[in-house]
Amino acid sequence: MLNNTNVLTSSLINDLKYTSLANFFDNGIKANFDLLLKNVNSVGKNTTVYKNSPQSELMSQYTYNVSLPLSKKTPRTFNTLEPKLSLRLSPHEMKNNTDTSRRINVNSIFLSDRLNLDNSLETGESI
């Protein structure tokens, strides 16, 4: 059974990701920054998702990651602990994704695209 046969959508998404090398400070702090540029080109016909005319959006996300690698060596064990802090900024107006069922879990919390959105980035600032 065919549904919505008159609905046409097309999108082309380009991502440019840059991660700097880790910088180690004298006090043991490790820091680096990430830059994510997303170019979304889209057009649609008879759809509420995309506009009828071609749209091009350029979005960016800046992330500054800081961590303090700690270790403790005993005669029997070697323990490590690495507290992390991630500062993020996405200064552009993004799509409203509150209705999507995206969840951040332990494995994705420090990823640059942690919500795994194709056509948008996480909006605002976060720590």
Residue ranges of predicted features:
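Outer-membrane beta-barrel translocator/pore domains, especially the C-terminal barrels
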Residues: 1-127
